[in-house]
Curated annotation (Swiss-Prot):
Complex and partners: Monomer.
Protein's name in the database: Gamma-crystallin S
PANTHER family in the record: BETA/GAMMA CRYSTALLIN (PTHR11818), GAMMA-CRYSTALLIN S (PTHR11818:SF6)
Recorded name of the encoding gene: CRYGS
Segments crossing the lipid bilayer: none
InterPro entries assigned to the protein according to its UniProt record, in alphabetical order: Beta/Gamma-Crystallin, Beta/gamma_crystallin, G_crystallin-like
Length: 178
């Protein structure tokens, strides 16, 4: 485990079997060590794991825990190639603003809590811009924390491309807490 207490282990086979690769820092390309990834054990920290090298492709956020099959982290397949530790803010404060239009225009909603459905909670169909005032958050493209994930640190996001999305399809979001 690193000095910061972060550690993740990737396994080629389900249920933590087969070849494995241990990592305690950001890694832009580990697919040369493993041909596939079917299970993961996060022993310290929260991690963002990516389908392609250089932190590209589908991203999955994994807090401490065991993931015996790729479906347990909502993976689409057994391909992962890069990872990075998620650095959580100190103090445990969380606050986010979401906007119905780009560049912080239109109706704005502010919350400090997780939201399983922006349609039910805020009567919004999409999120076109956002300001993360405190904490680290995950946007999900579907309700109930499903679908593609996007990691948002403390900063301003004027349009969906700023958080890595091709469209404003955000239907739920939540805080990353340790």
């Amino acid at each position: 485990m690193s000095k910061s207490g972060t550690k993740i282990t990737f396994y080629e086979d389900k249920h933590f079997q087969g070849r494995h690769y241990d990592c305690d820092c950001d890694c832009a390309d580990f697919h040369m060590y493993l041909s596939r990834c079917n299970s993961i054990r996060v022993e310290g920290g929260t991690w963002a794991v990516y389908e392609r090298p250089n932190f590209a492709g589908y991203m999955y956020i994994l807090p401490r825990g065991e993931y015996p099959e790729y479906q347990h982290w909502m993976g689409l397949n057994d391909r992962l190639s890069s990872c990075r530790a998620v650095h959580l803010s100190s103090g445990g404060q969380y606050k986010i603003q979401i906007f119905e239009k780009g560049d912080f225009n239109g109706q704005m909603y502010e919350t400090t809590e997780d939201c399983p459905s922006i349609m039910e909670q805020f009567h919004m169909r999409e999120v076109h811009s956002s300001k993360v005032l405190d904490g680290v958050w995950i946007f999900y493209e579907l309700p109930n924390y499903r679908g593609r994930q996007y990691l948002l640190d403390k900063k301003e996001y004027r349009k969906p491309i700023d958080w890595g999305a091709a469209s404003p399809a955000v239907q739920s979001f939540r805080r990353i807490v340790e």
